[in-house]
């Protein structure tokens, strides 16, 4: 009997054993919080890694680790278990306009690039109208020869359209 697992972060039901996935998944982001004990964030990271392992072993899917952290103390363990990884994912959503979050994201990028010797690419979930700030944040990775990929997504496209409409209103 095939196993079923409801993957709410993807809004779909995956039945393993019947299909071979040729897709890439980014591991879920079980939001880490800055105002809780560190063990809770470590547990959330572990849950995300468990789902990634399940997708990889049971569904034959390639799962890209999502790097998440709440504060500087989380940077200690964000690369645990990832030494042989060549691709990771970051989100800049909500971190561009806040100086503290922006600086923390920049430190996280540096930590990941320095800690993962086999890293070749970073996929960035970004919702800004242009990639100017993201390019600055990931400039350290680019300087080390890491390919930084910032694909379009629905929210980014919506923000681009809204910014063009706002520009046209004032033209």
Which residues does each PLM region occupy?
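Eukaryote-skewed repeat-based solenoidal scaffolds used as protein-protein interaction platforms
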Residues: 2-158
């Amino acid at each position: 009997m095939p196993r079923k697992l409801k993957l709410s972060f993807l809004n779909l039901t995956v039945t393993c054993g019947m299909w071979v996935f040729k897709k890439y998944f980014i591991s879920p982001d079980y939001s880490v919080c800055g105002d809780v004990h560190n063990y809770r964030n470590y547990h959330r990271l572990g849950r995300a890694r468990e789902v990634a392992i399940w997708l990889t072993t049971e569904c034959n899917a390639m799962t890209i680790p999502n790097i998440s952290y709440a504060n500087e103390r989380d940077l200690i363990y964000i690369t645990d278990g990832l030494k042989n990884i060549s691709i990771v994912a970051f989100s800049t959503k909500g971190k561009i306009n806040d100086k503290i979050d922006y600086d923390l994201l920049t430190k996280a990028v540096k930590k990941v690039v320095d800690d993962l010797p086999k890293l070749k690419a970073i996929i960035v979930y970004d919702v800004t109208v242009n990639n100017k700030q993201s390019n600055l944040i990931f400039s350290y990775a680019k300087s080390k020869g890491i390919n930084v990929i910032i694909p379009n997504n629905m929210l980014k496209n919506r923000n681009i359209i809204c910014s063009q409409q706002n520009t046209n209103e004032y033209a």
